[in-house]
Amino acid sequence: MMKKIDVKILDPRVRKEFPLPTYATSGSAGLDLRACLDDAVELAPGDTTLVPTGLAIHIADPSLAAMMLPRSGLGHKHGIVLGNLVGLIDSDYQGQLMISVWNRGQDSFTIQPGERIAQMIFVPVVQAEFNLVEDFDATDRGEGGFGHSGRQ
């Protein structure tokens, strides 16, 4: 069953100059988010900037959250990723969606108005309830940490 999410358009250019977020294909998990900018923004290597989307969402359902992720092509080809690596949007957040863009590449990168710069997915949320215990039931792995399960 499709879940409907309320979207508020904060910038009148959205839907006129810049399309609403869309799924690129029928199998796409992520919606493309666009840079709602007046002018192009040049991002020097190592720099970060906050880019508005012109949109606010209200998920409302506490069993859902949204995550903003980098677009694979921008990251691989240009070193453009999210400054916070992953953006988490809680179900009760109602403010504008802002994208922290980080140029981890070697060359300057120009973000154009309306350019697709991130993607957003919706994920189920399970809130944990902690149960204080003295010991855990034994497992094969035990307390083995980083690299314990091997490479193969």
UniProtKB/Swiss-Prot annotation:
Its cofactor is Mg(2+). Keywords: Hydrolase, Magnesium, Metal-binding, Nucleotide metabolism. It catalyses: dUTP + H2O = dUMP + diphosphate + H(+). Pathway: Pyrimidine metabolism; dUMP biosynthesis; dUMP from dCTP (dUTP route): step 2/2. The keyword Transferase does not apply. Disulfide bonds: none annotated. The keyword Metal-binding applies. Its EC number is 3.6.1.23. Substrate binds at residues 71-73, 84, 88-90, 98. PANTHER family: DEOXYURIDINE 5'-TRIPHOSPHATE NUCLEOTIDOHYDROLASE. This enzyme is involved in nucleotide metabolism: it produces dUMP, the immediate precursor of thymidine nucleotides and it decreases the intracellular concentration of dUTP so that uracil cannot be incorporated into DNA. This is Deoxyuridine 5'-triphosphate nucleotidohydrolase. It comes from Shigella flexneri. The lineage of its organism: Bacteria, Pseudomonadati, Pseudomonadota, Gammaproteobacteria, Enterobacterales. The gene is dut.
